[in-house]
Swiss-Prot record:
This is Thioredoxin domain-containing protein 17. Residues 41-123 form the Thioredoxin domain. It comes from the Eukaryota. Its main location: cytoplasm. Pfam families: TXD17-like_Trx (PF06110). The oxidized protein is reduced by TRXR1. The record marks 44-45 as: Contributes to redox potential value. GO terms for molecular function: peroxidase activity; protein-disulfide reductase [NAD(P)H] activity. The lineage of its organism: Eukaryota, Metazoa, Chordata, Craniata, Vertebrata. Keywords: Acetylation, Cytoplasm, Disulfide bond, Redox-active center. Disulfide bonds join 43-46.
Length: 123
């Protein structure tokens, strides 16, 4: 059995539903540019950060939930009124957060294995 549960979602509504379904659990969320049919994100920083974040998951506490959230295509993401920007204050991708706390890593911070590991391992 996995130490943690991973949920993959696309868009704000699916993210919101996933959070509601896992209410009461420690939730980490990784926001990334959406991928095309070939599995490639429009966000080059997200492509670089994903293996670092995946490696960091080895340090996540048992029973936590990891939500992998594709934020949409670039034009939607760049809209200052999109729900991620307005409701979650996620202003850049990639972003890794501990949901419900001020703890987050943004852009190049997601490339630093020590920071990713620290975020996942803090209680």
């Amino acid at each position: 059995m996995a130490r943690y549960e991973e949920v993959s979602v696309s868009g704000f509504e699916e993210f919101h539903r996933a959070v509601e379904q896992h209410n009461g659990k420690t939730i980490f969320a990784y926001f990334t540019g959406s991928k095309d049919a070939g599995g490639k994100s429009w966000c080059p920083d997200c492509v670089q950060a994903e293996p670092v974040v995946r490696e960091g998951l080895k340090h996540i506490s048992e029973g936590c939930v990891f939500i992998y959230c594709q934020v949409g295509e670039k034009p939607y993401w760049k809209d200052p009124n999109n729900d991620f920007r307005k409701n979650l204050k996620v202003t850049a991708v990639p972003t890794l957060i501990k949901y419900g706390t001020p703890q987050k890593l943004v852009e190049s911070e997601c490339l630093q294995a020590n920071l990713v590991e620290m975020l996942f391992s803090e209680d």
